[in-house]
Amino acid sequence: MSDSHLTAFDKASKAGFIIALGIVYGDIGTSPLYTMQSLVENQGGVNQVSESFILGSISLIIWTLTLITTIKYVLIALKADNHHEGGIFSLFTLVRKISPWLIIPAMIGGATLLSDGALTPAVTVTSAIEGLKAVPGLSHIYQNQTNVIITTLVILIVLFGIQRFGTGFIGKIFGPVMFIWFSFLGVSGFFNTLGHLEIFKAINPYYALHLLFSPENHRGIFILGSIFLATTGAEALYSDLGHVGRGNIYVSWPFVKMCIVLSYCGQAAWILANKHSGIELNPFFASVPSQLRVYLVSLATLAAIIASQALISGSFTLISEAMRLKIFPLFRVTYPGANLGQLYIPVINWILFAVTSCTVLAFRTSAHMEAAYGLAITITMLMTTILLKYYLIKKGTRPILAHLAMAFFALVEFIFFLASAIKFMHGGYAVVILALAIVFVMFIWHAGTRIVFKYVKSLNLNDYKEQIKQLRDDVCFDLYQTNVVYLSNRMQDHMIDRSILYSILDKRPKRAQVYWFVNVQVTDEPYTAKYKVDMMGTDYMVRVNLYLGFRMPQTVPRYLRTIVQDLMESGRLPKQEQEYTITPGRDVGDFRFVLIEERVTNARQLSNFERFIMQTKASIKHVTASPMRWFGLQYSEVTLEVVPLILSDVLKLPIKELVPVEDSEA
């Protein structure tokens, strides 16, 4: 890692400041749309709140943002970057060598982040469109919630529909729009507080603690379920670290926090001034002069779309990382933008669209969605805390300090989890079921991979070098291909899957000029692209280890083309002159990739549980991307061969021959 790269990552700039506003803070920046509304409605309405309730609520919000977002994520988690990348899977790659069980919190955290995030577009866009109820001239239309739902669904259809084309063309406006959004939050909130400056007493944590145990708080500790809505975007802040750099987050977060806090204070001041008016509108929109509300709704809708876009892009990145870490099935990934960071996964896109649309149709109002929102993200934060503890110890923090610090955050987040648990019966069960389904898929995929590693037999390539040379020179066999390439998941030193040698020598002897054995290894660094070659003392057998970062596409032919050129230029691989070609001077022959698919047999070594794992994994494979697409082989010559999973199972089954009995009269 060069000093210049490190400096750029930690350095802030004006452009980086604006970009960070558009990428990092969409979720947490749109929380003022619905957080105060949730608090007031759960208390029984505007006319049921008191000054002490409002002060306590604002104090709880301020200190939640301070403890969780500022201290845990901005000051601690942002230092846990994996070569400038953040997020729970990046954090896991930093600590996974410490203990194999750490894969569990990583899978749970990733699954809950994905499941709860599916609600973000629904709740933010619906909340923004519901603001039209407060707009003179449009209120009579949008008092009918069906019209709100239709408008929301149209926006979601467009939003998810444009993902396949890339969002770079609209991404350029995200930063400026969010700058206007946060500026409006801050300015409007400040002017609303001018008549009730006592609201700033909420900075004192006494009011927060007092409200939790006050009889004026009708919900008791469960009020924290609504308070938590203010900080649900903190995990996304960490996940987007690699997109904007640590320095830009350090500089932009104080501005964002100030604007958000002023917005909450402004809404609180409006509530205090209008608690006897009987107005039951969302405080966020009601606190703005009526003539400005249509512009505010437009701005809020744009902010909601930007927040949703950040969530969708984050989900693609999260799934992509999980696939490369071999804890999630392979799905087709495309790159519609000009950079690797802008990716698109069609299956995930439309699953997210289906879940989001069903959420809108099932819950109908943002108030009902808020009742289910936030439960799963508390689990994500707890899992991040577990991984952070091991990271701090690994980096040299005294164990007692790491344990105490993370125990404090775990306690705070566990209290939020308990407070949010009531949401399970109000729709949170849907999010939990989705999270459990994702965890189940991750577990099956990970466990299936471990079972294969446990049972598949490996052989030493050196023991078969002579046979392969004889086959190469045996003109009795037709030339199968100039270059035959085998992709192996397991290749250590000269040991290789028995199924590959079985394919070359036994199934149908494959005569070629050069045999390639390629193994792709995913590294902890996000953007690594390196390789290591072993010619095994020959010019016809090549072992290639590709080391690719967990965010790099695994398009093997592109890398192999470069490797072949390097080997020929260095004289390690003979040139393959072509007699017939449309490319003058072409000295590289044709290639065929052989993919071996291992299928479960009734092998005796497998326990019933292991057989269930492998059969379930095989079922999941039917809806996933083929290895041919995953490795970028769709434009290459490919042969798919099926072999039984357990080639080492040679136990003889008992069977007797029936011998005819001679006729007694003969």
From Swiss-Prot:
Keywords: Cell membrane, Ion transport, Membrane, Potassium, Potassium transport, Symport, Transmembrane, Transmembrane helix, Transport. It comes from the Bacteria. One of its GO terms (molecular function) is symporter activity. The chain crosses the membrane at residues 16-36, 58-78, 98-118, 141-161, 165-185, 221-241, 253-273, 299-319, 343-363, 373-393, 399-419, 424-444. Pfam families: K_trans, K_trans_C. It is a multi-pass membrane protein. It catalyses: K(+)(in) + H(+)(in) = K(+)(out) + H(+)(out). PANTHER family: K+ POTASSIUM TRANSPORTER, OSMOTIC STRESS POTASSIUM TRANSPORTER. Transport of potassium into the cell. Likely operates as a K(+):H(+) symporter. Belongs to the HAK/KUP transporter (TC 2.A.72) family. This is Probable potassium transport system protein Kup. It comes from Streptococcus pyogenes serotype M28 (strain MGAS6180). The gene is kup.
